[in-house]
Amino acid sequence: MAAQNKAMSGNRMLVFVPPHPLIKHWVSVLRNEQTPCPIFRNAMSELGRLLMYEASRDWLPIITGEIQSPMGVASVEFVDPREPVAIVPILRAGLALAEHASSILPATKTYHLGISRNEETLQPSVYLNKLPDKFPEGSRVIVVDPMLATGGTIVAAIDLIKERGVDNSQIKVICAVGAPPALQKLSEKFPGLHVYAGILDPTVNDKGFIIPGLGDAGDRSFGT
C-alpha cells in the first residue's frame, strides 16, 4: 500500500505546511508591519532554515557503513557528498530565506537567479542567470522564493531549471507564503513537484500581492 501511495503522489504536486510552532512564530513576526528590517530579515532566515530542514527530510542521498566508536563498532549513515544538491534563491528576497541553507545542507552549490516582475503586467523578466548550462545528472534542486503569489516568477524559474536537465520530482520549492494562483499554475505545469510553505494565504490582490501576506519581502528584508 505504501508503494502504491508513493506512486500516486508522483503524479501530482504536493504542498506541505509543516505544523511546527517555530514556523508559525517566525511567520507571525514576518506578518507584523511593525517588525523592523533587521528582525524581519532574521525571521526570514530562521524560517528558511526550518523549511530547508523539512524539505530535505527523506530526500537526501545516503551512504551507509560501519565506524569504530570509542566503545565499539556502530552502523552509520552519512549524507552522500558525491550526489549534487543545488540551492537556487530567486533574487533578491530569496537571499534572506536561503541564508542558512549551508548550515543545513553543507555540501550544496548555490546558483543565483534574478527575476523581476513588471508592476503593471505582472509578467516576469530574467535579469540575472547564474544557472549552469546543464545540471549534473541526478541533481536535486531546491528553489527558494519567499512569495508564491501570481506564479509567474516561480514558473519561469522552474522552466529554466528543467531546460537544464532536472526532472520535476528532483525539484523542491520553499516559500514563506503561498497563494492559490501560484499553486494552481505549479500544479498544472509541474506534476510531482513538492512545495514547502510557512503558511498558505487565501488570495492575491490586483497588484499581485498576497493578502494578508507580509508585504514586499525584498523591500522589508533589505530596507530598500
Curated annotation (Swiss-Prot):
Pathway: Pyrimidine metabolism; UMP biosynthesis via salvage pathway; UMP from uracil: step 1/1. The keyword DNA-binding does not apply. GO terms for cellular component: cytoplasm. SUPFAM superfamilies: PRTase-like. 5-phospho-alpha-D-ribose 1-diphosphate binds at residues 92, 117, 145-153, 216. GO terms for molecular function: GTP binding; uracil phosphoribosyltransferase activity. The keyword Cell wall biogenesis/degradation does not apply. Transmembrane segments: none annotated. Its cofactor is Mg(2+). It catalyses: UMP + diphosphate = 5-phospho-alpha-D-ribose 1-diphosphate + uracil. It comes from the Eukaryota. NCBIfam families: PRK00129.1, upp. Catalyzes the conversion of uracil and 5-phospho-alpha-D-ribose 1-diphosphate (PRPP) to UMP and diphosphate. PANTHER family: ADENINE PHOSPHORIBOSYLTRANSFERASE, URACIL PHOSPHORIBOSYLTRANSFERASE, CHLOROPLASTIC. This is Uracil phosphoribosyltransferase. It comes from Nicotiana tabacum (Common tobacco).
